[in-house]
């Protein structure tokens, strides 16, 4: 029996987004560390807020970072 995801983002979409991040980065190691750090930060934020995360922090970090790459207007200017 196949396990269905609760999210509209499929594994192939996640892989495609991760590949986009890696190909856009000048350094594969650095982008990997950035994704890991964001996921770690999200995990601690979810833990501090007593939220039950519906999506794993690494997947959420990949989605957020790829969205920032493809849609720079969501970051906003400081």
From Swiss-Prot:
Disulphide bridges, residue numbers: none
Q: Name one GO cellular component term.
A: DNA-directed RNA polymerase complex
Which Enzyme Commission number(s) are listed?
A: 2.7.7.6
The molecular function GO annotations come to: DNA binding; DNA-directed RNA polymerase activity
Catalysis performed (reactions)? RNA(n) + a ribonucleoside 5'-triphosphate = RNA(n+1) + diphosphate
InterPro entries found in the cross-reference section: DNA-dir_RNA_pol_omega, Pol_omega/Rpo6/RPB6, RPB6/omega-like_sf
GO terms for biological process?
DNA-templated transcription
Q: Name one Pfam family in it.
A: RNA_pol_Rpb6
Please give the superkingdom of this protein's source: Bacteria
Protein keywords: DNA-directed RNA polymerase, Nucleotidyltransferase, Transcription, Transferase
Its biological function? Promotes RNA polymerase assembly. Latches the N- and C-terminal regions of the beta' subunit thereby facilitating its interaction with the beta and alpha subunits.
Q: Which family does it belong to?
A: Belongs to the RNA polymerase subunit omega family.
Q: How does it assemble?
A: In cyanobacteria the RNAP catalytic core is composed of 2 alpha, 1 beta, 1 beta', 1 gamma and 1 omega subunit. When a sigma factor is associated with the core the holoenzyme is formed, which can initiate transcription.
The protein's name: DNA-directed RNA polymerase subunit omega
Q: Which organism is it from?
A: Nostoc punctiforme (strain ATCC 29133 / PCC 73102)
Q: Which gene encodes it?
A: rpoZ
């Amino acid at each position: 029996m196949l396990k269905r995801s609760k999210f509209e983002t499929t594994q192939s979409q996640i892989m495609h987004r991760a590949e986009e991040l890696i190909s856009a980065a000048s350094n594969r190691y650095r982008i990997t560390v950035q994704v890991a750090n964001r996921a770690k930060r999200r995990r601690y934020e979810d833990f501090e807020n007593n939220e039950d995360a519906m999506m794993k922090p690494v997947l959420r970090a990949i989605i957020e970072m790829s969205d920032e790459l493809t849609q720079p207007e969501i970051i906003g200017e400081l």
